[in-house]
UniProtKB/Swiss-Prot annotation:
Stored Pfam families: CitG
NCBIfam families in alphabetical order: citrate_citG, PRK10096.1
Alphabetized Gene3D superfamilies for the sequence: Triphosphoribosyl-dephospho-CoA protein
InterPro entries: CitG, TriPribosyl-deP-CoA_syn_CitG
UniProt-listed Enzyme Commission number(s): 2.4.2.52
TM region(s), chain numbering: none
Gene: citG
UniProt-recorded name of the protein: Probable 2-(5''-triphosphoribosyl)-3'-dephosphocoenzyme-A synthase
Length: 292
């Protein structure tokens, strides 16, 4: 694996520490995809609303991405002395190379493109914080990642071009900023909602898988998921948010018996061809940040 040219600065970080964070990123991706049952998403039970990917694709993809996570951390450390707004430009070639390995591992299937963006940002933020001898906490990591993305939504979503990307179209039609907006804001859905919710459930003694499933429902209820909107429009997104909110209001996922509600929700998502991939990406970040 060749590393794109990124910086001439050297890092003082221990390889073991870098590898430890990279391993957490890999475990976060595996934890999410193996979590079952998940409405509309690939898991151990079925392929959700996806006909082009399976569980094994995600396992291969996560392994391919793990090899690149140290590069994001290293670049974050090596670029610690430059303005944060300039970091994203240097991260892009690493992300593109990582994406290439993902596609090679899955024979062209897009399993984790969103996670390459979000985990890459968080890993770079961790590298920067470590290099500057600053505390590595969920809040500092996400605020540092946000500083890398300052102005990103304006630059990439606000355009008058006739040839719009899917993200630009959803922004113009529905005002959804997707992964870019969440990153630029410092991942508030994770920091202010999903992470405290998940940690509270764990503190209450709830089984970790049930706690993650309940946290996924919370994310589905509040996230303007562009993956869902691109498949089902505004109506599909509002339906999914309402269904998730209804399950939470009924008590959420607290016992194995509650999994029947998720299985029914899964069947309905498959029938409507809806997959909350954006919320799945945020769940990966939630688990990852809970470990640091």
């Amino acid at each position: 694996m060749s590393m794109p040219a990124t910086s001439t600065k050297t890092t003082k970080l221990a390889t073991s520490l870098i590898d430890e964070y990279a391993l957490l990123g890999w475990r976060a991706m595996l934890t999410e995809v193996n979590l079952s049952p998940k409405p509309g998403l690939v898991d151990r039970i079925n392929c959700g609303a996806h006909k082009d990917m399976a569980l094994e694709d995600f396992h291969r993809s996560a392994l391919a991405i793990q090899g690149w996570l140290p590069r994001f951390i290293e670049f974050g450390a090596c670029s610690a002395e430059i303005a944060p707004e300039a970091v994203l430009h240097g991260l892009r070639p690493i992300g593109m190379a990582c994406e290439g390995d993902m596609f090679r591992a899955t024979a062209g299937v897009n399993t984790h493109k969103g996670s390459i963006f979000s985990l890459g940002l968080l890993c770079a933020a961790i590298g920067r914080l470590l290099q500057l001898n600053q505390p590595v906490t969920p809040t500092t990591v996400c605020s540092t990642a946000a500083s890398f993305c300052r102005g990103l939504t304006d630059r990439e979503l606000r355009t008058n071009n006739s040839q719009l990307t899917a993200g630009q179209r959803l922004y113009q039609q529905l005002g959804l900023t997707g992964a870019r907006g969440e990153a630029e804001a410092g991942y508030p859905l994770v920091i202010n909602h999903a992470l405290p919710h998940y940690l509270t459930l764990l503190d209450q003694g709830l089984d970790p898988e049930l706690a993650l499933l309940d946290t996924l429902l919370l994310l589905m209820a509040i996230n303007g998921d562009t993956n869902v909107a691109s498949r089902g429009g505004e109506g599909g997104l509002r339906w999914l948010q309402r269904e998730a909110q209804t399950l939470l209001q009924k008590g959420g996922i607290r016992t194995p018996a509650d999994l029947d509600y998720l299985r029914q929700f899964d069947r309905e998502c498959i029938e409507r061809n809806l997959s909350p991939g954006g919320s799945a990406d945020l769940l990966i970040l939630t688990w990852f940040l809970a470990q640091i």
